[in-house]
C-alpha cells in the first residue's frame, strides 16, 4: 500500500475534502486508513470502571485509501 502509518496526507475526495492530517493506522485488507482529525464520528459509550460517566466520545473513522494523497512521507518510511 502506498500509505504508511505516520505519513502526512491530504484528503482529495469526499465530505472531508481538503483536510490534512497524519495517518494513525492502516488496514491493508480493507484498503482503509485512519487520519488524525479527519472523519470524526461520535460513539455512545456505557459507564464503566475506566469511564465512570459514559456519554458520547468522538473518534476518527476510517476512509478509503484512494481518497487520500501523500504530502510527506514519515521519516522512518523514507526509502
Curated annotation (Swiss-Prot):
Keywords on record: Ribonucleoprotein, Ribosomal protein, RNA-binding, rRNA-binding
Any one biological process term the GO annotation gives: translation
Domain of life: Bacteria
InterPro entries linked: KOW, Rib_uL2_dom2, Ribosomal_uL24, Ribosomal_uL24_CS, Ribosomal_uL24_KOW, Translation_prot_SH3-like_sf
Stored CDD domains: KOW_RPL26
Pfam families: KOW, ribosomal_L24
Annotated GO MF terms: rRNA binding; structural constituent of ribosome
Summary of the function given for this chain in its UniProt record: One of two assembly initiator proteins, it binds directly to the 5'-end of the 23S rRNA, where it nucleates assembly of the 50S subunit. One of the proteins that surrounds the polypeptide exit tunnel on the outside of the subunit.
Binding partners and assembly: Part of the 50S ribosomal subunit.
Stated family: Belongs to the universal ribosomal protein uL24 family.
Protein's name in the database: Large ribosomal subunit protein uL24
Organism: Lactobacillus delbrueckii subsp. bulgaricus (strain ATCC BAA-365 / Lb-18)
Amino acid at each position: 500500500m502506498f500509505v504508511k502509518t505516520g505519513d502526512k496526507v491530504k484528503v482529495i475526495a469526499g465530505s472531508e475534502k481538503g483536510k490534512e492530517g497524519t495517518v494513525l493506522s492502516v488496514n491493508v485488507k480493507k484498503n482503509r486508513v485512519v487520519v488524525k482529525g479527519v472523519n470524526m464520528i461520535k460513539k455512545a459509550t456505557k459507564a464503566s470502571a475506566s469511564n465512570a460517566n459514559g456519554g458520547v466520545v468522538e473518534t476518527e473513522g476510517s476512509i478509503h485509501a484512494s481518497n487520500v494523497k501523500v504530502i510527506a512521507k514519515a521519516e522512518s518510511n523514507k526509502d
